[in-house]
Design a protein with these regions (language model features):
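Short metal-coordination and nucleic-acid-contact micro-motifs, chiefly zinc-binding Cys/His arrays
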Residues: 250-252, 269
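Short, cysteine/histidine-rich loop/knuckle motifs that typically chelate Zn2+
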Residues: 256-261, 275
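Cysteine-rich micro-motifs
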Residues: 269-280
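Cys/His-rich microdomains that often coordinate metals
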Residues: 260-264, 280
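Acidic, proline-/serine-/threonine-rich low-complexity intrinsically disordered repeat tracts
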Residues: 236-248
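Internal maturation/activation junctions in enzymes
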Residues: 12-99
Length: 284
Protein backbone atom coordinates (compact mmCIF):
# COMPACT_ATOMS: atom_id res chain seq x y z
CA UNK A 1 0.00 0.00 0.00
CA UNK A 2 1.03 3.61 -0.43
CA UNK A 3 2.07 3.45 -4.10
CA UNK A 4 -0.06 6.46 -5.05
CA UNK A 5 1.42 8.43 -2.14
CA UNK A 6 4.95 7.61 -3.30
CA UNK A 7 4.23 8.84 -6.81
CA UNK A 8 2.74 12.07 -5.46
CA UNK A 9 5.74 12.67 -3.18
CA UNK A 10 8.01 12.14 -6.19
CA UNK A 11 5.94 14.45 -8.40
CA UNK A 12 5.02 11.73 -10.90
CA UNK A 13 1.52 11.22 -12.27
CA UNK A 14 -0.05 7.81 -11.65
CA UNK A 15 -0.64 6.06 -14.99
CA UNK A 16 1.68 8.28 -17.02
CA UNK A 17 4.64 6.93 -19.01
CA UNK A 18 7.05 8.57 -16.56
CA UNK A 19 5.13 7.18 -13.59
CA UNK A 20 5.02 3.66 -15.04
CA UNK A 21 8.77 3.74 -15.74
CA UNK A 22 9.37 4.71 -12.11
CA UNK A 23 7.01 1.98 -10.85
CA UNK A 24 8.74 -0.56 -13.11
CA UNK A 25 12.11 0.25 -11.51
CA UNK A 26 10.69 -0.09 -8.00
CA UNK A 27 9.09 -3.48 -8.59
CA UNK A 28 12.12 -4.76 -10.49
CA UNK A 29 14.26 -3.97 -7.44
CA UNK A 30 11.75 -5.71 -5.16
CA UNK A 31 11.59 -8.82 -7.36
CA UNK A 32 15.35 -9.13 -7.81
CA UNK A 33 15.97 -8.67 -4.08
CA UNK A 34 13.31 -11.24 -3.17
CA UNK A 35 14.73 -13.83 -5.58
CA UNK A 36 18.29 -13.20 -4.39
CA UNK A 37 17.14 -13.85 -0.82
CA UNK A 38 15.30 -17.03 -1.82
CA UNK A 39 18.41 -18.36 -3.59
CA UNK A 40 20.45 -17.67 -0.44
CA UNK A 41 17.86 -19.58 1.61
CA UNK A 42 18.08 -22.47 -0.86
CA UNK A 43 21.84 -22.63 -0.25
CA UNK A 44 21.22 -22.86 3.49
CA UNK A 45 18.05 -24.94 3.78
CA UNK A 46 17.64 -26.60 0.40
CA UNK A 47 15.59 -25.89 -2.70
CA UNK A 48 11.87 -25.93 -3.27
CA UNK A 49 11.17 -29.70 -3.71
CA UNK A 50 9.76 -29.44 -7.24
CA UNK A 51 13.18 -28.25 -8.43
CA UNK A 52 14.94 -31.34 -7.08
CA UNK A 53 14.96 -34.42 -9.30
CA UNK A 54 15.91 -38.04 -8.66
CA UNK A 55 19.43 -37.34 -9.89
CA UNK A 56 21.61 -34.37 -10.86
CA UNK A 57 20.63 -34.61 -14.52
CA UNK A 58 16.91 -34.47 -13.74
CA UNK A 59 17.46 -31.64 -11.25
CA UNK A 60 19.25 -29.55 -13.88
CA UNK A 61 16.49 -30.27 -16.40
CA UNK A 62 13.80 -29.11 -13.95
CA UNK A 63 15.67 -25.93 -13.10
CA UNK A 64 16.44 -25.19 -16.74
CA UNK A 65 12.76 -25.53 -17.57
CA UNK A 66 11.89 -23.20 -14.68
CA UNK A 67 14.26 -20.39 -15.68
CA UNK A 68 13.02 -20.59 -19.27
CA UNK A 69 9.45 -19.68 -18.26
CA UNK A 70 8.11 -16.29 -19.33
CA UNK A 71 8.49 -14.66 -15.93
CA UNK A 72 12.01 -15.93 -15.21
CA UNK A 73 13.26 -14.90 -18.66
CA UNK A 74 12.92 -11.28 -17.52
CA UNK A 75 15.17 -11.84 -14.52
CA UNK A 76 18.84 -10.74 -14.57
CA UNK A 77 21.43 -13.35 -15.57
CA UNK A 78 22.79 -13.77 -12.03
CA UNK A 79 19.32 -14.73 -10.75
CA UNK A 80 18.81 -17.33 -13.48
CA UNK A 81 22.31 -18.74 -12.93
CA UNK A 82 21.73 -18.86 -9.17
CA UNK A 83 18.49 -20.81 -9.58
CA UNK A 84 20.16 -23.21 -12.01
CA UNK A 85 22.99 -23.87 -9.57
CA UNK A 86 21.28 -23.80 -6.16
CA UNK A 87 17.55 -23.92 -6.84
CA UNK A 88 15.18 -21.58 -5.05
CA UNK A 89 13.60 -21.89 -1.63
CA UNK A 90 10.11 -20.57 -2.48
CA UNK A 91 7.73 -21.53 -5.27
CA UNK A 92 6.30 -17.98 -5.32
CA UNK A 93 7.58 -14.83 -3.68
CA UNK A 94 5.48 -11.82 -4.57
CA UNK A 95 1.85 -10.76 -4.57
CA UNK A 96 -0.06 -7.57 -3.82
CA UNK A 97 -3.10 -7.51 -1.52
CA UNK A 98 -5.91 -4.90 -1.74
CA UNK A 99 -5.33 -3.52 1.82
CA UNK A 100 -8.59 -1.56 1.62
CA UNK A 101 -9.16 -1.37 5.38
CA UNK A 102 -5.54 -1.28 6.57
CA UNK A 103 -4.57 1.40 4.08
CA UNK A 104 -7.48 3.57 5.18
CA UNK A 105 -6.64 2.95 8.84
CA UNK A 106 -3.03 4.09 8.38
CA UNK A 107 -3.97 7.06 6.20
CA UNK A 108 -2.31 6.02 2.94
CA UNK A 109 -3.49 4.89 -0.48
CA UNK A 110 -4.64 1.27 -0.59
CA UNK A 111 -2.80 -1.50 -2.41
CA UNK A 112 -1.71 -0.48 -5.89
CA UNK A 113 -4.67 1.83 -6.32
CA UNK A 114 -4.70 5.57 -6.83
CA UNK A 115 -6.91 7.46 -4.40
CA UNK A 116 -10.58 6.94 -5.27
CA UNK A 117 -10.90 10.64 -4.53
CA UNK A 118 -9.02 12.91 -2.15
CA UNK A 119 -12.26 13.36 -0.21
CA UNK A 120 -14.90 10.62 -0.27
CA UNK A 121 -17.20 8.46 1.85
CA UNK A 122 -16.59 4.80 2.68
CA UNK A 123 -19.39 2.45 3.70
CA UNK A 124 -18.71 0.92 7.12
CA UNK A 125 -19.76 -2.50 8.39
CA UNK A 126 -22.86 -1.04 10.08
CA UNK A 127 -24.10 0.55 6.85
CA UNK A 128 -23.06 4.07 7.82
CA UNK A 129 -20.79 6.20 5.68
CA UNK A 130 -17.45 7.39 7.03
CA UNK A 131 -15.87 10.50 5.52
CA UNK A 132 -12.29 9.94 4.36
CA UNK A 133 -9.94 12.85 3.64
CA UNK A 134 -6.53 12.08 2.18
CA UNK A 135 -3.86 13.27 4.60
CA UNK A 136 -1.38 13.80 1.77
CA UNK A 137 -3.43 16.75 0.49
CA UNK A 138 -3.26 18.52 3.86
CA UNK A 139 0.48 17.85 4.01
CA UNK A 140 0.99 19.41 0.59
CA UNK A 141 -1.12 22.47 1.40
CA UNK A 142 0.81 23.03 4.63
CA UNK A 143 4.04 23.14 2.60
CA UNK A 144 2.42 25.24 -0.15
CA UNK A 145 0.06 27.71 1.57
CA UNK A 146 -0.30 29.68 -1.65
CA UNK A 147 -2.37 26.83 -3.16
CA UNK A 148 -5.87 25.51 -2.44
CA UNK A 149 -7.51 22.09 -2.85
CA UNK A 150 -8.78 23.29 -6.22
CA UNK A 151 -5.24 24.11 -7.36
CA UNK A 152 -3.38 20.87 -6.75
CA UNK A 153 -0.63 19.79 -9.21
CA UNK A 154 -1.44 17.36 -12.03
CA UNK A 155 0.09 14.42 -10.16
CA UNK A 156 -2.75 14.59 -7.62
CA UNK A 157 -4.98 12.40 -9.77
CA UNK A 158 -7.83 10.17 -8.58
CA UNK A 159 -9.08 6.80 -9.82
CA UNK A 160 -12.05 8.18 -11.75
CA UNK A 161 -9.91 10.82 -13.47
CA UNK A 162 -7.77 8.09 -15.01
CA UNK A 163 -8.82 6.31 -18.18
CA UNK A 164 -9.30 2.52 -18.01
CA UNK A 165 -6.28 2.21 -20.33
CA UNK A 166 -4.11 4.05 -17.79
CA UNK A 167 -5.28 1.70 -15.03
CA UNK A 168 -4.40 -1.28 -17.25
CA UNK A 169 -0.97 0.18 -17.98
CA UNK A 170 -0.11 0.41 -14.29
CA UNK A 171 -1.32 -3.12 -13.54
CA UNK A 172 0.57 -4.71 -16.43
CA UNK A 173 3.74 -2.77 -15.56
CA UNK A 174 3.65 -4.16 -12.02
CA UNK A 175 2.60 -7.68 -13.07
CA UNK A 176 5.83 -7.95 -15.05
CA UNK A 177 7.72 -8.29 -11.75
CA UNK A 178 5.13 -10.10 -9.60
CA UNK A 179 5.14 -13.89 -9.92
CA UNK A 180 1.65 -14.37 -8.45
CA UNK A 181 -1.56 -12.48 -9.01
CA UNK A 182 -2.19 -8.92 -7.82
CA UNK A 183 -5.24 -7.00 -6.66
CA UNK A 184 -6.12 -4.04 -8.87
CA UNK A 185 -9.39 -2.47 -10.00
CA UNK A 186 -9.79 -0.85 -13.39
CA UNK A 187 -12.30 1.95 -12.80
CA UNK A 188 -14.54 2.79 -15.76
CA UNK A 189 -17.01 5.68 -16.05
CA UNK A 190 -20.79 5.35 -16.07
CA UNK A 191 -22.20 4.14 -19.37
CA UNK A 192 -19.21 1.96 -20.24
CA UNK A 193 -20.48 -0.69 -22.66
CA UNK A 194 -20.04 -4.46 -22.61
CA UNK A 195 -17.73 -4.31 -25.63
CA UNK A 196 -15.59 -1.65 -23.94
CA UNK A 197 -15.32 -3.77 -20.79
CA UNK A 198 -14.40 -6.78 -22.94
CA UNK A 199 -11.61 -4.75 -24.54
CA UNK A 200 -10.22 -3.89 -21.09
CA UNK A 201 -10.02 -7.60 -20.25
CA UNK A 202 -8.30 -8.30 -23.57
CA UNK A 203 -5.79 -5.54 -22.87
CA UNK A 204 -5.11 -7.00 -19.41
CA UNK A 205 -4.60 -10.48 -20.87
CA UNK A 206 -2.36 -9.30 -23.68
CA UNK A 207 -0.39 -7.16 -21.22
CA UNK A 208 0.46 -10.21 -19.11
CA UNK A 209 -1.92 -9.69 -16.17
CA UNK A 210 -2.82 -12.88 -14.29
CA UNK A 211 -6.25 -11.50 -13.37
CA UNK A 212 -8.29 -8.36 -13.49
CA UNK A 213 -11.32 -6.55 -12.12
CA UNK A 214 -13.29 -3.91 -13.99
CA UNK A 215 -15.78 -1.79 -12.07
CA UNK A 216 -18.14 0.48 -13.98
CA UNK A 217 -19.17 3.41 -11.81
CA UNK A 218 -22.80 3.19 -10.69
CA UNK A 219 -23.26 -0.39 -11.92
CA UNK A 220 -24.45 -1.51 -8.46
CA UNK A 221 -27.35 -0.26 -6.35
CA UNK A 222 -24.93 0.48 -3.50
CA UNK A 223 -21.20 1.14 -3.48
CA UNK A 224 -18.49 0.77 -0.84
CA UNK A 225 -16.88 4.03 -1.99
CA UNK A 226 -18.90 7.06 -3.01
CA UNK A 227 -18.51 10.81 -3.31
CA UNK A 228 -21.83 11.38 -1.51
CA UNK A 229 -22.96 10.07 1.89
CA UNK A 230 -26.26 8.68 0.59
CA UNK A 231 -27.44 5.92 2.88
CA UNK A 232 -28.55 2.69 1.23
CA UNK A 233 -32.29 2.28 1.68
CA UNK A 234 -34.32 -0.92 1.56
CA UNK A 235 -37.32 -0.49 -0.71
CA UNK A 236 -38.66 -4.04 -0.53
CA UNK A 237 -40.63 -5.43 2.39
CA UNK A 238 -38.51 -7.93 4.31
CA UNK A 239 -40.48 -10.80 5.81
CA UNK A 240 -39.00 -12.93 8.60
CA UNK A 241 -38.21 -16.52 7.68
CA UNK A 242 -40.40 -19.15 9.32
CA UNK A 243 -38.82 -21.06 12.18
CA UNK A 244 -39.14 -24.83 11.80
CA UNK A 245 -38.12 -27.17 14.59
CA UNK A 246 -36.47 -30.39 13.36
CA UNK A 247 -36.48 -32.90 16.20
CA UNK A 248 -35.26 -36.01 14.40
CA UNK A 249 -32.06 -36.23 12.31
CA UNK A 250 -32.72 -36.35 8.58
CA UNK A 251 -30.76 -38.90 6.57
CA UNK A 252 -29.48 -38.49 3.03
CA UNK A 253 -32.15 -39.19 0.43
CA UNK A 254 -35.09 -38.22 2.65
CA UNK A 255 -37.55 -35.44 1.83
CA UNK A 256 -36.58 -32.02 3.17
CA UNK A 257 -38.64 -31.26 6.32
CA UNK A 258 -38.53 -27.53 5.51
CA UNK A 259 -39.72 -27.13 1.91
CA UNK A 260 -41.05 -30.71 1.42
CA UNK A 261 -39.89 -30.61 -2.19
CA UNK A 262 -36.17 -31.34 -2.33
CA UNK A 263 -34.20 -34.24 -0.90
CA UNK A 264 -31.38 -34.13 1.63
CA UNK A 265 -27.91 -34.78 0.20
CA UNK A 266 -24.38 -34.56 1.61
CA UNK A 267 -22.87 -31.48 -0.07
CA UNK A 268 -19.58 -30.05 1.16
CA UNK A 269 -19.82 -32.00 4.42
CA UNK A 270 -23.32 -30.68 5.21
CA UNK A 271 -26.78 -32.27 4.96
CA UNK A 272 -28.24 -29.91 2.36
CA UNK A 273 -31.63 -29.68 0.65
CA UNK A 274 -31.39 -29.89 -3.14
CA UNK A 275 -34.30 -27.44 -3.49
CA UNK A 276 -34.23 -24.75 -0.78
CA UNK A 277 -30.50 -25.28 0.00
CA UNK A 278 -31.03 -25.24 3.78
CA UNK A 279 -28.21 -26.94 5.73
CA UNK A 280 -29.58 -29.08 8.55
CA UNK A 281 -26.33 -30.51 9.86
CA UNK A 282 -22.64 -30.16 9.10
CA UNK A 283 -20.01 -32.74 9.95
CA UNK A 284 -17.50 -30.01 10.81
Amino acid sequence: MGLADLLIYCGKKYGSAEGNQFVDQIFEAMAVTAYEASIELAKEKGSFPFLIGKNDQETQALRKKFIDTGYMKKMPAHIREGVLRFGIRNSHLLTVAPTGSTGTMTGVSTGLEPYYSFSYFRSGRLGKFIEINAEIVDEYLMDHPERTKAELPAWFISAMELTPEEHVGVQCTIQRWVDSSISKTVNAPKGYTVSQVAKVYRDLYEGGAKGGTVYVDGSRDSQVLTLEAVENELTAQVEPLPVVQVNEPVASGEICPICHEGTIEEIGGCSTCTNCKIQLKCGL
